[in-house]
Amino acid sequence: SNSNPKTKGDNSKDIRGFAIKLLGVDGEKCESNESGTQDFLLINTNIMPIGTLKLFHDAIYYMTKSNPLIFGGELLIQGKLVKILNLIKNMKHETSPLDVRYFSTTPYMFGDKIVKYILIPTSTYKSKLPKNLTATYLSENMQNHLKKHEATFDFLIQIQTNENEMPTNDASITWDIKKSKIVKVATLKIPIQIFATKERYKLAENLSFSPGHSLIEHRPIGDINEARVKIYEEMSKFRHSGNSEALYEPSNKDFYHIK
């Protein structure tokens, strides 16, 4: 995925997303629209520079219905503008989505602890940046990787140890790893496969991801996550309605014979 409101090619620098959907997950869920899944949503930056729900609201309001300069002033006063500029400055062309670190940026429960998630690539095979950056080079590099090699990641958590220095309602603040080390809890393996097929693209288009697709024990917390759950649900309904498709929860059988 990308963060730009308009779809752009892979040759445009942007924030990239990574979503994981576990199947066959039994237990009480935060949202009732999927009963057997657990989703993890991450992006390739460890913060959301705007940070707070109020500023996200103001961003939409001032950029669409009022004067964007007012919002720029608000960002400057609250110290967010420099974070946005630094993020833009540090954007680069990635070699492949399978070679990138990803972060949840927002917090979740982990039993009685509050954590953030981190995904670190560990594959032996690494893609190379092509000389000609086409609009589909990331997809092509990912497909070339998975044709002959599996992709692997370490899935880690970072536990909140100080609620003032590691707030739940400001995603622009980095949780200091010197004060809370990251801990590996799982390995993610993506097997050798051909994913660029009509059937797989159709399945992907029918899927919905949300922080709310979660066990209560791993529920999303904080203002931003609360808003995301509601917004993602409405966006999914809108997208499925536009495609004349019903909302759909996948199961293991969807992947047994897919081409």
Feature locations, PLM:
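Active-site-adjacent core segments of small-molecule enzymes
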Residues: S1-K259
